């Protein structure tokens, strides 16, 4: 478990040592003034190596002293000392004390640091060294400063600075620095302790702390993280100051005071742990007496609640014990349905429509496994009659037995108890058993699988008197057989245009048969229509869950072609497939999606991906359903990306209105369909200036859905960015409600190879975050 944070002030720069990406031009510019140790590194016990001394003149009073005068150069291993004059003294004690005093233009360097000063003293017995009125410069990385006196102790483990300073800015640039009456650098523990610390900008003190501990390496250290400030119409001024607490090697926490001028002080807390039982994250956010929420309730724009406190609790855990036990928790609960509308959070989004609360305990052996779970949902909809169900509990069993002669056996079983989130909805206990036998056949270029399955389900339903559907029955048995046969072949050849490229041709065919069974007497507890992309054409189910098992008498055919380069990197693929229905699939009453009572209906789906070169990429997909007579869904992305800071992406997504009304009636905001075009761009204006932007337009509503623009200025030792975002946060009287938000960030930089403009981070902050196309 490892988490390294940049801390406030100098810490924001120290941790940047370990960034992975660099803006090449600025990185090269920042390294121009940095010394590099270009001599061969000598390993071993350096103190046992011989000492070589060169000087214009020398005098000796053996064995008590020796003096070297003029252009003195002393070298031992990787260490070099030069000065105008050097004197070596040795006492005549039983254990002689040997010291060296250097004066005049003293210069010391090794692979880690360079020291300069008018005078230096060193104890050759224990290697203690003092440098007076010294300047120091780190080697191979940014970092320099001064000290009235610099002391090296503990075989150079400790560097103690009296009235010391530190900055990551290049020589001649003092944009910022940290000053302390005493600074102790511990190279082994990788930490710097500063007493009476003053943070200065352009030599003007702006922050004081009696004690400050800063990381100077990759070890985790407690401290303040980079602050964040923003302003929005709905929330006013916001300021976040995170504090990272390194509790133990396997525990840490982040505590973030979050001031919101229109709401109050919110505390965001995250705790991470790693134990024998697994790894996990706990989060608790709390805002006492939300002032804006009180006002919103008075205007009926927020749900009426007795409490005005806003909070979030989150727990995610994943663990394995003794190689057979598995523990998983995914639990999110908020104070009210509008929480994610009012607060941005990494733990959920208002577009999800609900918060998941799931606990599961699993046990696995070689041929079987079992999982006991509970699943609940906190629904954000204000409709209390909405049909959403909890599974409390649910038991899933799987048994596998391969190589039964030529056959493979699988048995799946489930028992679940469903309770309703809303009022006056049916509830049930469901038992399901699903044995299947497979006959797989394959060789080097083809495969075939034949499967016979039996799906037996029993329902014991509790039906309230207020239920509108009179067809529901308390006890229902449903038994359905299924037969599926699928075959696939793979052919390959060298391409005509380039013999180093390989093209594959992959035809695929599947026949699926499930007889019809009227299921209108069963309430729908957990089934929803699955998306039919190309891979979805070859599923054996139209619905997820078990409450709706559609009839099927259909043949699915598909063809995929791929092109690989000489390094076996996939450069292009195209898949096109269709389902031909001999009988219309149905589960009971007709709906828009299966309203036509005729054979010959088809569903088409295609996906493509084209990596044109290392900078250009294209991908997309489309589904067409003859039952609706329309394109049901489509998406396309064209992207140019030269590096992390230079990219332009054009994207489009479409979902047909009839398809949504047939499959997602509980999403009123999208009942008119989805048709959105987006443009995302990031580009450096110069080595130091960068611009990012994102614009999404809803062609159905004929209005912008989201807009984002950000400007960043980056130097070798600090960076600043300003962002503006306009997004839809709700609906009122069928009109969109927008929020305008300004954000401001200041970051110290310098001791790293990371001179990136941070464009990716800015694009990820939007309500529709950037996603790579390739």
From Swiss-Prot:
Highest taxon of the lineage: Bacteria
Pfam families found in the cross-reference section: LptD (PF04453), LptD_N (PF03968)
GO biological process: Gram-negative-bacterium-type cell outer membrane assembly; lipopolysaccharide transport
Location(s), subcellular: Cell outer membrane
Signal peptide (residue range): 1-24
Family designation: Belongs to the LptD family.
PANTHER family (alphabetical): LPS-ASSEMBLY PROTEIN, LPS-ASSEMBLY PROTEIN LPTD
Subunit structure: Component of the lipopolysaccharide transport and assembly complex. Interacts with LptE and LptA.
Record's protein name: LPS-assembly protein LptD
